[in-house]
C-alpha cells in the first residue's frame, strides 16, 4: 500500500483526487492536511516544487502538492498560475471580458502535481493538460473556474455542467493523476 499526504485545504480538490486515484483499485491511500506554505510566483512547475519541498519538511513524510493554471492563448498564457487571484478579483464575467476583442477564446487547463517521498528528497512532477475554450459561465459555480472552461472533448459543456465522474475522465487533474498513479504503482513493485 502506497500512501501520501495531499497538501490541500480544498475539500473539492481532495474529493476529486480521491475519486480519481480510487479507480481501478490502485492501492494508493490518500490523506490530506492543510499546510501553511508560502504563496509564490513563477511557473506552475516552480510553484508546485517549492510548495512540495516546504510541505515535506513540515510533515516529515511523503506528500503531494498541486498547482493549477488556466492559460488563455490570446493573453500568451495569462492568467496561468494566477487564475485564483484573477477569479477572486474579477470573477467569471471579468475573465470573459479579458478576451473581448481577441480572435480566440482558446485556453489550456494545466495541472501540475509534485510528489516528494519525504524530507530532503527532490520532488517529481506530473502534468496534465486539457484544451478548451473560455465561455460565459454555465453550470454550478461551486468549483473555481469550472463554469467558464469548456473542454474541446466535453460535448459543448463546461466542466461545471458535467457530473464528477464525467469530468474526472477528461480533466487536466485526471491526466496528471494518472501519471502519478503509474509512477507510484511502478515504485511499489
Swiss-Prot record:
Pfam families in alphabetical order: Ham1p_like
GO molecular function: dITP diphosphatase activity; ITP diphosphatase activity; metal ion binding; nucleoside triphosphate diphosphatase activity; nucleotide binding; XTP diphosphatase activity
Keywords per UniProt: Cytoplasm, Hydrolase, Magnesium, Manganese, Metal-binding, Nucleotide metabolism, Nucleotide-binding, Nucleus
GO CC list: cytoplasm; nucleus
Gene3D superfamilies cross-referenced by the UniProt entry: 3.90.950.10
Compartments (UniProt record): Cytoplasm; Nucleus
Positions that bind Mg(2+): 39
Its EC number(s): 3.6.1.66
SUPFAM superfamilies linked: ITPase-like
Keyword Cell cycle attributed: no
Residues the entry annotates as binding ITP: 8-13, 51, 67-68, 84, 143-146, 167, 172-173
Source organism, top-level taxon: Eukaryota
Top-level enzyme category: hydrolase
Catalytic activity annotation: ITP + H2O = IMP + diphosphate + H(+); dITP + H2O = dIMP + diphosphate + H(+); XTP + H2O = XMP + diphosphate + H(+)
GO BP terms in the entry: deoxyribonucleoside triphosphate catabolic process; nucleoside triphosphate catabolic process; nucleotide metabolic process
Cofactor(s) needed: Mg(2+); Mn(2+)
Cofactor binding, per record: Binds 1 divalent metal cation per subunit; can use either Mg(2+) or Mn(2+).
Subunit comment: Homodimer.
PANTHER family, sorted: INOSINE TRIPHOSPHATE PYROPHOSPHATASE (PTHR11067:SF9), INOSINE TRIPHOSPHATE PYROPHOSPHATASE/HAM1 PROTEIN (PTHR11067)
HAMAP family found in the cross-reference section: HAM1_NTPase (MF_03148)
Family stated for the protein in its record: Belongs to the HAM1 NTPase family.
Summary of the function given for this chain in its UniProt record: Pyrophosphatase that hydrolyzes non-canonical purine nucleotides such as inosine triphosphate (ITP), deoxyinosine triphosphate (dITP) or xanthosine 5'-triphosphate (XTP) to their respective monophosphate derivatives. The enzyme does not distinguish between the deoxy- and ribose forms. Probably excludes non-canonical purines from RNA and DNA precursor pools, thus preventing their incorporation into RNA and DNA and avoiding chromosomal lesions.
Protein name, as recorded: Inosine triphosphate pyrophosphatase
Native organism: Cryptococcus neoformans var. neoformans serotype D (strain JEC21 / ATCC MYA-565) (Filobasidiella neoformans)
Lineage per the UniProt record: Eukaryota, Fungi, Dikarya, Basidiomycota, Agaricomycotina
Amino acid at each position: 500500500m502506497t500512501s501520501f499526504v495531499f497538501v490541500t485545504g480544498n475539500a473539492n480538490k481532495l474529493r476529486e483526487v480521491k475519486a480519481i486515484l480510487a479507480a481501478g483499485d490502485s492501492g494508493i491511500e490518500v490523506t490530506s492536511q492543510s499546510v501553511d506554505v508560502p504563496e509564490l510566483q513563477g511557473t506552475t512547475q516552480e510553484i508546485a516544487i517549492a510548495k512540495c519541498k516546504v510541505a515535506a519538511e513540515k510533515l516529515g513524510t511523503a506528500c503531494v502538492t498541486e498547482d493549477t493554471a488556466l492559460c488563455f492563448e490570446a493573453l500568451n498564457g495569462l492568467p496561468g498560475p494566477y487564475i485564483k487571484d484573477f477569479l477572486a478579483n474579477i470573477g467569471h464575467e471579468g475573465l470573459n471580458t479579458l478576451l473581448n476583442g481577441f480572435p480566440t477564446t482558446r485556453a489550456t487547463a494545466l495541472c501540475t502535481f509534485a510528489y516528494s517521498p519525504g524530507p530532503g528528497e527532490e520532488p517529481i512532477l506530473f502534468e496534465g493538460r486539457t484544451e478548451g475554450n473560455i465561455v460565459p459561465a454555465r453550470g454550478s459555480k461551486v468549483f473555481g473556474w469550472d463554469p467558464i472552461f469548456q473542454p474541446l472533448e466535453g460535448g459543448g459543456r463546461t466542466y461545471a455542467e458535467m457530473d464528477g465522474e464525467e469530468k474526472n475522465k477528461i480533466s487536466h487533474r485526471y491526466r496528471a493523476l494518472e501519471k502519478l498513479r503509474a509512477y507510484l504503482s511502478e515504485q511499489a513493485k
